[in-house]
Structure formats: C-alpha cells, structure tokens
Swiss-Prot record:
Protein name per its UniProtKB record: N-(5'-phosphoribosyl)anthranilate isomerase
EC class: isomerase
GO BP of this protein: L-tryptophan biosynthetic process
E.C. code: 5.3.1.24
Keywords associated with the record: Amino-acid biosynthesis, Aromatic amino acid biosynthesis, Isomerase, Tryptophan biosynthesis
Pfam families: PRAI (PF00697)
Gene Ontology molecular-function annotations: phosphoribosylanthranilate isomerase activity
Annotated metabolic or biological route of this protein: Amino-acid biosynthesis; L-tryptophan biosynthesis; L-tryptophan from chorismate: step 3/5
Signal peptide boundaries: none
Catalytic activity line of the entry: N-(5-phospho-beta-D-ribosyl)anthranilate = 1-(2-carboxyphenylamino)-1-deoxy-D-ribulose 5-phosphate
Length: 204
C-alpha cells in the first residue's frame, strides 16, 4: 500500500515521513491552514529522496501558474481539488491527480470521465478543499471497476485507528492523510510513523 502524507510545511517532518516509509508527500499551494510558498516547498523538496513523489495541491488555479510552480519546485505530480476539467488536465505537462468529493455512488461513476493519471476520492468539501478530518461512507466505493481501483487514492478523515477498515473496504492504490497525523494542527511525527506502519501492515 502506497502512503501519501499531505500538508508538509517543514523539512524535518518531510524527512521523518520519508524515513518511516512514506511514498509521497503533498504540498498545498491553495488556501489552507497548511499553505506553503513555492520557495519554501522547493527548499524542502531539494532535501528529499528522488524516489519519493512530490505532489502539489491546487484549487482552481490557472494551468500556467500550476505548470510554473511544478517546474520551479520539482514536483512529480499535481493534485487538482477544484472544478478543473479535461481541457485543463490535457494542457498540463505533468502527472495529474483529480480530487472528487464523495456523496453517492454516482461520484465514483463520474470519476471515470476524467482523463487523469489518478483519482483521489475525498470527503465533500467544506471551508477548505481537503484536509478537513472527516470521513465519508467507504462502502460507496465498494463496487469500483478494477481499472479505476488501480489508480484510486483514498483520503478523507483517515487515521491510524480507521485505516485498516478503509483499506479493506476500498482497496485503493494509495491512501492520503493530513489532519489524521496532526496534534493541535501540527504534523506529529509519531502519528505519521504509526499511520504508515498500520497502512503497510494491513495491506500485506
């Protein structure tokens, strides 16, 4: 099971997550409690192992700005959390993840129309797109087509206590966590470690 730790804002946490086995780190460039500047993200990314994916999170940003930040920072993927469409996705010269909030099985079916490398299923948006710490009914994704499952990233309120059930129900390619590995709004390296251990163990 691949694991992504999202909302990285400092190099110490980023390095610790990599040491504990994180496969991907997320950097939020949209409005969020975890927003980071391109300059700071680049500084962190330069310190990371080459095999760890570096994913930039954007919401309704222009293709030009997304591509510029991706190139400057050394991102490997971009994650689109807004109302982006296939026209915008096709114009991006980088691997792409489209995020969708899940309220019904229809959302899973709608995901198949996006011409993207991965689909991230998340809880419905609130004040911020993602990182709200709330789960959704994983059973809605239980009858996912095999081809879609192979490129599914599961997010939304995941933590060390519920990750086993989430993986067992959805069987995604990757799981994505942010608030579930925080204490009082800050990344907690011990929670990151425990989350990664649980996610990797229950997928063996």
């Amino acid at each position: 099971m691949k694991v992504k730790i999202c909302g990285i804002t400092d190099v110490e946490t980023a390095k610790s997550a990599c040491e504990y086995g994180a496969d991907a780190l997320g950097f939020v460039f949209a409005e969020s409690k975890r927003k980071i500047t391109p300059k700071r993200a680049k500084e962190i990314i330069q310190e990371l192992p080459a095999n760890v994916l570096k994913i930039g999170v954007f919401v309704n940003e222009s293709v030009e700005v997304i591509q510029k930040i991706a190139d400057e920072c050394g991102l490997t993927h971009v994650q689109l959390h807004g109302d982006e469409d296939n026209y915008q996705i096709r114009r991006l010269n980088i691997l792409c993840i489209k995020s969708l909030g899940v309220t019904s099985e229809r959302d899973m079916k709608n995901a198949q129309r996006y011409e993207t490398d991965y689909i991230l299923f998340d809880s419905p948006k609130e004040k911020f797109h993602g990182g709200n710490g709330k789960t959704f009914s994983w059973e809605l994704l239980g009858h996912m087509p095999k081809e879609l499952r192979k490129k599914t990233i599961l997010a939304g309120g995941l933590n060390a206590l519920n990750i086993e059930e989430a993986i067992r129900t959805v069987r995604p390619y990757m799981v994505d966590v942010s608030s579930g590995v925080e204490t009082e709004g800050k990344k907690d390296v011990e929670k990151i470690k425990q989350f990664i251990i649980k996610a990797k163990e229950c997928s063996k």
